[in-house]
Amino acid sequence: MSDRKMWSNLSGQKLNKEQTLWSFGRCKTLILEMFCGAMILTALAAAAGWPVSQPTDIEMDGIDLLVPTDRRAIEEQIERDDPFCLVMPFPCGPWNSLTYWNASRHPEFKIRNEALQKKHVPMLKWLCSIAKKRIARGRLVLMENGQTSRAWNLKCFEELEGLLDGLQSDASFEYGIGDQCLLGQHDRESGEPMRGRTKWGTNGEILKQNINPMWEQ
């Protein structure tokens, strides 16, 4: 998704930084990005003066969330920092439509991908367990993956639907579908918009509002 566009919308609320975070149970940071890539959200938050958690990505810090010890390290960081918003755009490789198309044509590829999925499932279950804890604590969670990702069919993701926010009784975790082009996604060479059909999950009403008008239940 376009991190820059989303953060621009969020930061437009003109919130008092020193008061807002602390009013939500004394969060130490605004955001922790997992699978952060270029860590654009973290950079924008820091540039705006917000305290941020150290983002994590295997290409940046070597933290591999497929490894139990690395997952424990990040879980300890989450407990220590208590970030207000946890962003989790988990890997789509083993679950996307193109992967399944290739698997339907090449039996050996299908075998390899099924093994990779089995390797990823414990990590995805862990992400969902973290999300449950954060939601119950009244913190924001934002998950993202392709609309057709088969990962969404896993029971752990289905169990998140409808979870009530721990601080706001009228808020709950919901999934929505929309196009990333409305958040600024485009082809790097041609500059033309790219649809990027995507599914998000969040308990944050402000996130849902800023993803609108494309939020589809």
Task: Mark where each language-model region is.
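Conserved active-site and SAM-binding loop architecture
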Residues: 1-217
